[in-house]
Design a protein with these regions (language model features):
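Active-site entrance/lid segments in N-terminal catalytic domains of soluble metabolic enzymes
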Residues: 1-193, 197-209
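Residue-level detector of alpha-helix initiation sites
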Residues: 142, 220-221
């Protein structure tokens, strides 16, 4: 369907990772949630020039359930006025205690659309179709009908992530071309069912509806894990966290250091970044919002991002300048597979390691059968 050499999908917000993986025989998927129809062209122009004609895709995020659903023309600025004072003060106190000074919402977002804005996502896709993209993907629910129709009109497959069997059934019935069975080990927004259980459960559930390829996602860091998922019936592996520790990644050196030092138990599923359950690295930020008795609790999506994104950006900048308390606050989306990451590699090397690990696993299993 996609014309790739090795069914390793690399989701990344970094264009360098996307291009490197596609050139190496995998399939890079560019995360475009933070982009607009105007600035997406710069990113995709660069990818077009650096993939040697190899295929890549784009991922957007159109939540089915959004606190502002049905409201029109919402900007980050207009949302900011609706944030409760208790949440403002709590976030401000965390930053002040760490000696961190954030920018205002006005400086951070200006007149940009609200975070996770559905209308903006569809406009980004329209702009993306001016480039040779070979896949569009969506998370947090069934893609809107307009997105599925766009894909069909351009001959581009539509993928969507599912964290539960019932979600996958709805995706198959809606007409998506590829389902990503994302286990609870995954970084970012995820469900509660493990990858080992979810992959065969979804394959079994959608088979009577129609033939839909299912990719495995959630905690996959090695080629051996990829082989195991494909033994379960997956058509490939959708990965994310492993690329955060690459040389090319958009993550800061401080975060990469924290990743390498972390165990799988340090990847916690909390709401303190986006307002929806999302797995990220445990930090003073996540611990305060989740466990301090004076915490007002997370706001629903999209409000929470207006508090968290600038706060955590400012904390990262301060941490890079040597602020130890700010370093304690630093976090980012990452899955439980972080416990398997112990060094920083180039993206091409990661692809090669996946291939070798996959081959080694298949050879071991074949040898067991032969015995």
């Amino acid at each position: 369907m996609l014309g790739i050499e090795f069914p390793l999908f690399a989701f990344s917000h970094c264009r360098d990772v996307v291009a490197a993986v596609s050139r190496a025989g995998g399939f890079g998927v560019f995360g475009a949630v933070a982009h607009t129809p105007d600035n997406i062209h710069e990113e995709l122009d660069w990818i077009d020039a650096h993939t040697d004609g190899k295929p890549y895709g784009i991922d957007v995020l159109v939540p089915e359930n959004l606190a502002t659903r049905g409201e029109g023309s919402i900007t980050a600025r207009s949302l900011e006025a609706r944030i409760p004072e208790a949440h403002r003060l709590f976030a401000a106190s965390l930053l002040a205690d760490a000696g961190v000074t954030p920018r205002s919402v006005e400086e951070s977002f200006g007149d940009r659309p609200q975070p996770f804005d559905p209308e903006n996502a569809l406009l980004v896709l329209e702009a993306a179709f001016k480039h040779p993209i070979k896949l569009i993907a969506n998370a947090l629910g069934v893609p809107p009908r307009e997105m599925i129709e766009m894909g069909k009109a351009h001959g581009v497959p539509v993928a969507a992530l599912a964290g539960a069997r019932e979600h996958a059934v709805r995706l198959a019935e809606a007409g998506v071309d590829i389902i990503v069975a994302q286990g609870g080990e995954a970084g970012g927004h995820c469900g509660e069912v493990s990858t080992l259980v979810l992959v065969p459960e979804i394959i079994k559930a959608v088979a009577p509806i129609r033939n839909v390829p299912v990719l495995a996602a959630g905690g996959i860091i090695t080629g051996e894990q990829m082989a195991a998922c494909m033994a379960l019936g997956a058509a490939g592996a959708w990965t994310g966290s492993v690329w955060l520790a690459t040389v090319e990644s958009e993550t800061s050196p401080v975060f990469r250091e924290k990743m390498i030092a972390a165990s799988s138990r340090d990847a916690v599923r909390v709401c303190s970044r986006t307002g929806k359950p999302a797995r990220q690295l445990r930090s003073a930020w996540t611990e305060a919002w989740e466990h301090r008795p004076d915490s007002p609790g997370a706001l629903p999506m999209p409000f929470m991002s207006l508090i968290s994104e600038e706060a955590l950006r400012a904390a990262t900048v301060a941490a890079e300048r040597g602020n130890a308390k700010a370093r304690d606050l630093v976090t980012y989306f990452v899955g439980q597979g972080v416990g398997l990451i112990d060094d920083v590699r180039g993206a091409v090397q990661v692809v090669q390691d996946f291939k070798q690990g996959y081959i080694d696993a298949i050879e071991r299993m074949t040898a067991l059968i032969a015995e």
